[in-house]
Amino acid sequence: GYTGCELQDDINSDPKALAMFETIRAHGAVKMGLIKHVDEAAKRQHTPKVAFVAAPKTYASSSGKVVEAAGIDLLVRAMSMGKLHHAMMGTAAVAIGTAAAVPGTLVNLAAGGSDREAVRFGHPSGTLRVGAQAVLENGQWAVKKAIMSRSARVLMEGWVRVPSDTF
C-alpha cells in the first residue's frame, strides 16, 4: 500500500503502479459514463483523474522541505496524464475540498471525519488550502461554493521591441 507521502519518482518509476492507476482510471471512466469501454480510456487521458488520500503524516516535499503532520489535515497524491503530478491540479484540489466537506467520504474521513468547510492538504510540492460548502438537500448533497487560491511563479520575462511608428 501507499502512505500518501510518495513523490513523483516513487510512482512514476514503477510501471506496475502506473498500470494499476490507469486500470482504476479506465474503469472509473466507464462507471462515470465518460466512455463505453475501458479500451477507450487511452484516447481520453485528461479525465477522470485518480487521487489517493491518507491521514496526515510528516513528510519531505519534492524540494526537501519538511511538511509537518500538525500543519495539514490529510495527504493527497493525484495522477495526471498517466503520471503522479508534481503538485496538485486545480480541478483535483477543488474536488478534494468538496469531498472533505461531505461527511463520510474517504477524503472527509482521512481528514478526521469532522464537519468542515476548509481543508489543508499535503501534496508532493508542499501544501494547499481549499474549501467548499456542501449541504444535504432532499437526500442529495449539493455544493454551494468551492474555494481555492493558487500561487504563481514567474514563467518568463523579456522585452518586446515595437517600432515607434506603430502607435
Which residue ranges define each predicted feature?
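Active-site proximal loop and beta-alpha junction motif in alpha/beta enzyme cores
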Residues: 1-167
